[in-house]
Amino acid sequence: GCYVFKVVQDAQYRRLASLQSPLWVGAMALLINSKKSKVFRWHDSGDVQDEAHLMKIFAVCKLTPGTRHWLPTREAWIKHFLPECPDNLVIRFSAPMVDQDAPGSWPTTSTVTSSHNSENCPAFRTDKTGTVHTLEAFDTMTKENKKDLDLGHCGSCRNCWNPEVKNVAYGQH
């Protein structure tokens, strides 16, 4: 959704408030385990609130061993908890500035670059069917073409969930 709309903001606040429920961990695990997809991204908006929230995420990951989890974050304090991180969770520290180098002190990171090239995450040119369009084709697309194709999908790429991929670079948009 578009985060400027009140209905979306209200839903975000409800999700935040739900973290206080003692049923949250079990409910999240049930929902994740019921999905066909075996990858899960935490937070399309927002971040880890505090240590209790992080521990709940760890608990959900432990209850969903068949799912690979990815947690993007800008919360540097989380680094102290990396030794406790479940094996099926990749925590990527996001560099806060465009064209900033990946923080060397984190095992897995993400960066944003002002250049679009084939080394970047292909989501910006991947449509809803999973087709990855070439850079050349993308550069010729109109705004309307891009909207119709519904670009911005992962397709078959799973780099964000792969702990062997040290940094994922996203093109600025």
Predicted segments — roles?
Residues 1-173:
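Class I S-adenosyl-L-methionine
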